[in-house]
Amino acid sequence: MALSISIYFLLIFLSHFPSSHAEPFIGVNYGQVADNLPPPSETVKLLQSTSIQKVRLYGADPAIIKALAGTGVGIVIGAANGDVPSLASDPNAATQWINSNVLPFYPASKIMLITVGNEILMSNDPNLVNQLLPAMQNVQKALEAVSLGGKIKVSTVNSMTVLGSSDPPSSGSFAAGYQTGLKGILQFLSDTGSPFAINPYPFFAYQSDPRPETLAFCLFEPNAGRVDSKTGIKYTNMFDAQVDAVHSALKSMGFEKVEIVVAETGWASRGDANEVGASVDNAKAYNGNLIAHLRSMVGTPLMPGKPVDTYIFALYDENLKPGPSSERAFGLFKTDLSMVYDVGLAKSSSSSQTPSGKVTSSGWCVPKKGATNEELQASLDWACGHGIDCGAIQPGGACFEPNNVVSHAAYAMNMYFQKSPKQPTDCDFSKTATVTSQNPSYNNCVYPGGGGGGGGGGGGSKAVMNKYVSSDKVEKKNGATEPKVSSSLSFLLIFLSLIFHVYM
């Protein structure tokens, strides 16, 4: 019995170790306002060829939910705005909704969240707004009645217009007209451990302020940044600023601990003549840099160290959506399953390895002394979003440790430099980088480059200690550098040793 308990706690402990391939924070919206979509079975094959771990549906299409069974892909299903009145007024309607849309598929299909309505608070329909919370409560009770209350969460989705103030991010607050309705909803989310779902779109922020510096800020590209006048924090991208504004708004109402989920964000690859910024290049830059930013695990300035679960809009272009041309051009993939543009979502067997490190240049590109973490994070996001394989600095990769911005930026900057024509501007990164003759490789983390007398980065060369590895991460051993065993791993080894001595 004691051994079983020990193993149980060991499994819990091990579950907190990251997988080298799992990216549970990256999802995609699977819209269906189209008449040319591939069958669900083909879409599932497409998803399985990527690192996408979650899918958000706007409804509860049984064919899609069933097709996702056994894949491990997390699923968000939705009750439509038109369902809200009956769900609010009749608990039996909520029970029937769960019986029809959840029970036939769960747990084979990994349903995680039910969104009740989409942007209802902004609908200007007071009756619908008043019915939203009762509808959510009845859906929650229906889940609890079948013992799924703690396994499937219930929320609703909001647009950024729910905020009355968002600049600076630390002053974020909900619009006065929404606060009364939100108070009960936020209490419900807090009580049930459910997330606050929001739709931030830097794409629309740029359209309202189409300056070059705004575009760079929205696309995660190197820029001067924007300083929060209250906190002194410099923001280098619009996404973080918008998400932190939502966090501040939640905090202002006493719900700081309610988790934020980005239910939608994306960038149009084409648009009408008056839709500034809608292009393939900008869409690739935004989504690619966003994914790189999430993979960096840096979080946001007000929520550091934790990537926000984010659903990119959208999986496919939807040719029947009304409105301007951009509404039909947010897809990552065409309906023939080919990519509209590549943002690095395809699975790669080499994601946990470093390149061979052949001598390709006379030097390595590394951060300049004095560059700030904010500047380096922007450079890291930009490099990884422009065709660089940053798998080595993701969890499980050979260069993931030390897990800090400086080390990860050094690797990404150098990878970009080695793939470029190696002009001085290719190792500039807004004046935050420089070329060095000192090989920054360490242990099994190989930085391609070198040449001349500097010593290549190949496996047979003796790499000098990477000065971007912080002193608390390394110690010298026989002239080489070795990573210290992390406290978590030390605990694990001690734990296993105790089990061995007690039970063997």
UniProtKB/Swiss-Prot annotation:
Keywords: Cell wall, Cell wall biogenesis/degradation, Disulfide bond, Glycosidase, Hydrolase, Secreted, Signal
Active site positions, chain numbering: 119, 264
Leader sequence segment: 1-22
Pfam assignment, any one: X8
Record-listed E.C. numbers: 3.2.1.39
Glycoprotein listed as a keyword: no
Reaction equation(s) it catalyzes: Hydrolysis of (1->3)-beta-D-glucosidic linkages in (1->3)-beta-D-glucans
PTMs per UniProt: Contains two additional disulfide bonds.
Disulfide bonds, paired cysteine numbers: 365-427
Main subcellular localisation: secreted
PANTHER family: GLUCAN ENDO-1,3-BETA-GLUCOSIDASE BG1-RELATED-RELATED
Family: Belongs to the glycosyl hydrolase 17 family.
Protein name: Glucan endo-1,3-beta-glucosidase 7
Organism of origin: Arabidopsis thaliana
Organism classification: Eukaryota, Viridiplantae, Streptophyta, Embryophyta, Tracheophyta
